[in-house]
């Protein structure tokens, strides 16, 4: 367990990622564009490196469509899979045998994790929080408030249409 933990520790340090380490677990954040930061926990176990990343809280609506979209995305991911916990919160999860823990493989794994956490974020919001986003948009426009952080949704908000995200 010492060698894989050291490989991970060295990787995080070399990439200027601040982390906390406790009892074989590493916690850190990966910066994104759509999702400002993805919280990640990596557990170094006796046989595997387990990676867990929080993507989004339990959607307010449209659960079946959100979960179906995530399951379809699982067919196209490298090393990571979408999962939900008992509260319905959405995660990306991965397992890597310790014998495969190298800086290059950690880079591929975390790259895949960030690509999918960040790249899916707006679609998950569109599918699972459209009503809340629409209310926020209307409230801000009525009061002359900035809608800058809602720009990704402007198209369907201005037309009054339902969001139609790209296929996975």
Kindly give the residue locations of the regions a language model identified:
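Amphipathic alpha-helical segments
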Residues: 1-18
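Short solvent-exposed loop/turn micro-motifs enriched in small/polar/acidic residues
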Residues: 12, 33-35, 74-76
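Short, surface-exposed charged micro-motifs
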Residues: 16-18, 39-41, 81-83
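Ser/Thr-rich, low-complexity intrinsically disordered terminal regions
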Residues: 20-38, 46-49
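Short, internal acidic amphipathic alpha-helical interface segments
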Residues: 52-93
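A generic structural motif
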Residues: 55-59, 96-105
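A contiguous, mid-protein "functional segment" used to position or interact
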Residues: 100-141
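Short, highly charged C-terminal tails/helix-capping segments
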Residues: 125-167
